[in-house]
UniProtKB/Swiss-Prot annotation:
It comes from Bos taurus (Bovine). Composed of three domains: a modulating N-terminal domain, a DNA-binding domain and a C-terminal ligand-binding domain. The lineage of its organism: Eukaryota, Metazoa, Chordata, Craniata, Vertebrata. Binds DNA as a homodimer. Can form a heterodimer with ESR1. Interacts with NCOA1, NCOA3, NCOA5 and NCOA6 coactivators, leading to a strong increase of transcription of target genes. Interacts with UBE1C and AKAP13. Interacts with DNTTIP2. Interacts with CCDC62 in the presence of estradiol/E2; this interaction seems to enhance the transcription of target genes. Interacts with DNAAF4. Interacts with PRMT2. Interacts with CCAR2 (via N-terminus) in a ligand-independent manner. Interacts with RBM39, in the presence of estradiol (E2). Interacts with STUB1/CHIP. Phosphorylation at Ser-84 and Ser-102 recruits NCOA1. Keywords: Activator, DNA-binding, Lipid-binding, Metal-binding, Nucleus, Phosphoprotein, Receptor, Steroid-binding, Transcription, Transcription regulation, Zinc, Zinc-finger. One of its GO terms (molecular function) is estrogen response element binding. Nuclear hormone receptor. Binds estrogens with an affinity similar to that of ESR1ESR1/ER-alpha, and activates expression of reporter genes containing estrogen response elements (ERE) in an estrogen-dependent manner. A zinc finger (NR C4-type) spans 146-166, 182-206. PANTHER family: KNIRPS-RELATED PROTEIN-RELATED. The modification Phosphoserine is found at residues 84, 102. GO terms for biological process: cellular response to estradiol stimulus; estrogen receptor signaling pathway; negative regulation of transcription by RNA polymerase II; positive regulation of DNA-templated transcription; regulation of transcription by RNA polymerase II. Residues 261-495 form the NR LBD domain. Pfam families: ERbeta_N, Hormone_recep, zf-C4. This is Estrogen receptor beta.
Length: 527
């Protein structure tokens, strides 16, 4: 019996073993519809989760010949309504079986059913990014791309559409103890061709696009997802019951914060990280006015993102507005400086204020009094470099600087006293997270205690550099060397009048609200 392809079929011939035919056909040529050629499968005796099925591969067309026989003895032609195991695995919604139709009366294409068609898989296997002429517009619309590197996605993994490479990379990262460090400025481009160049930036982008542990592994984490949903429902029921009874909400919110494990808290701090801010570098050589103008503009932009970062820390917005404003006013320059030190940790002798504003020590000679501050920043950064500060440790240290910055007498009002208890509870949670990060390093107990002490002792050096920087900035403001506006001016005025303030003024109350409106206007300038 001769087998011929229909005019709409693929270019590669498809062989069929007539000895295995179960159809009572008369001898003579028959035409296979294109949908059957397109969706042919081999059913072998393997389980659904076997590597042969999960790692679905298309055989090379060069091996297809007239004499090629299938390796499975139970080959049947799939009906048009049949879905491959790959489609069932990738499809996020429920699939309903379509009524079976006569294959000889209607040839229906599967391009509208399969989320990833054969041409897409062929291009993915060969690594080619060029479009195939056989790809129809509907198949292009149905194809999904990796949210991390923009390559063709193989399925819905860990909560997002991703390719096999990024899925495997994220799996290795969350299962192992990999503390990646970016050799550059933590803003490497991650795409199909450069995704392997920087593991730290690739993992950061995985978290940015929303990849989470067990985000889409329904077949392995179904019980965990159901259990988490049940726990969430119980928490919501508890909250609603407390609201109806009019009882205090403080205890419930503290329980929700306590439910966060140190690992979950660190991941939340990672997701709350502000983006890098770009500032146009002035023409060289620097003058006192040009350098101070660049630094003050950069500080004003970073303040907007810093307030947004603080509000993303679990439990911070539950504090009273008085405590929120006091904490931000007390530590804003320390937070900016420790971020500067982290960006400069891999660049000895340089200060990475921004990706496009990198200064050497000697460039600070043009500004009176700033060279001493540069030396303090470089010395503290060198000490962090000697300790080999890890990214997760940096996240916890920065949060501790914010939460431990208030040095005022305890308030007597019940509301303020309750906020103080929340602040202490939150600071303890961040401290536990730092201890957990250090314990993951595999060091002995004595070495862990010594490392924790060394990191905490460096916070006093950061505070000292911050005080020097504040004095210098106020001096430049008084001399009218550079104009100061917006949030930076608000922070400087608060620092000047801090000793005379006993209540939260109207300008302080508007500090957080003004930052939200300004954040929306400055988002296009941040990377």
């Amino acid at each position: 019996m001769d087998v011929k392809n229909s005019p709409s079929s693929l270019n590669s011939p498809v062989s069929y073993n007539c000895g295995q035919s179960i159809l009572p056909l008369e001898p003579g040529p028959i035409y296979l519809p294109s949908s059957y050629v397109e969706s042919r499968h081999e059913y072998s005796a393997v389980t659904f989760y076997s590597p042969a099925v999960m790692n679905y591969s298309i055989p090379n067309n060069s091996e297809d010949g007239p004499g090629r026989q299938t390796t499975s003895p139970n080959v049947l032609w799939p009906t048009p309504g049949h879905l491959s195991p790959l489609a069932i695995h990738c499809q996020p919604s429920v699939l309903y079986a379509e009524p079976q139709k006569s294959p000889w009366r209607e040839t229906r294409s599967l391009e509208h059913t399969l989320p990833v068609n054969r041409e897409t898989l062929k291009r993915k296997a060969s690594g080619s990014s060029c479009a195939s002429p056989a790809t129809s517009p509907s198949s292009k619309r149905d194809a999904h791309f990796c949210a991390v590197c923009s390559d063709y996605a193989s399925g819905y993994h860990y909560g997002v559409w991703s390719c096999e490479g990024c899925k495997a990379f994220f799996k290795r990262s969350i299962q192992g103890h990999n503390d990646y460090i970016c050799p550059a400025t933590n803003q490497c481009t991650i795409d199909k061709n450069r995704r392997k160049s920087c593991q730290a930036c690739r993992l950061r982008k995985c978290y940015e696009v929303g990849m989470v542990k067990c985000g889409s592994r329904r077949e392995r984490c179904g019980y965990r997802i159901v259990r988490r949903q049940r726990n969430s429902d119980e928490q919501l029921h508890c909250l609603s019951k407390t609201k109806r009874n009019g009882g205090p909400m403080t205890r419930v919110k503290e329980l929700l914060l306590s439910a966060l494990s140190p690992e979950q808290l660190v991941l939340t701090l990672l997701e709350a990280e502000p983006p890098h801010v770009l500032i146009s570098r002035p023409s060289t050589p620097f003058t006192e006015a040009s350098m101070m103008m660049s630094l003050t503009k950069l500080a004003d932009k970073e303040l907007v993102h810093m307030i947004s970062w603080a509000k993303k820390i679990p439990g911070f917005v539950e504090l009273s507005l008085y405590d929120q404003v006091r904490l931000l006013e007390s530590c804003w320059l320390e937070v900016l400086m420790v971020g500067l030190m982290w960006r400069s940790i891999d660049h000895p002798g340089k200060l990475i204020f921004a990706p496009d504003l990198i200064l050497d020590r000697d460039e600070g000679k043009c500004v009176e009094g700033i060279l001493e501050i540069f030396d303090m920043l470089l010395a503290t950064t060198s000490r962090f470099r000697e300790l080999k500060l890890q990214h997760k440790e940096y996240l916890c240290v920065k949060a501790m600087i914010l939460l431990n910055s208030s040095m005022y007498p305890s308030a007597t009002a019940p509301q303020e006293a309750d906020s103080g208890r929340k602040l202490t509870h939150l600071l303890n949670a961040v401290t536990d997270a730092l201890v957990w990060v250090i314990a993951k390093s595999g060091m002995s107990s004595q070495q862990q205690s010594m490392r924790l002490a060394n990191l905490l002792m460096l916070l006093s050096h950061v505070r000292h550099a911050s005080n020097k920087g504040m004095e210098h900035l106020l001096n430049m403001k008084c001399k009218n060397v550079v104009p100061v506006y917006d949030l930076l001016l608000e922070m400087l005025n608060a620092h000047t009048l801090r000793g005379n303030k006993s209540l939260v003024t109207g300008s302080e109350r508007n500090l957080v609200e003004d930052s939200e409106s300004k954040e929306g206007s400055q988002k296009p300038q941040a990377q």
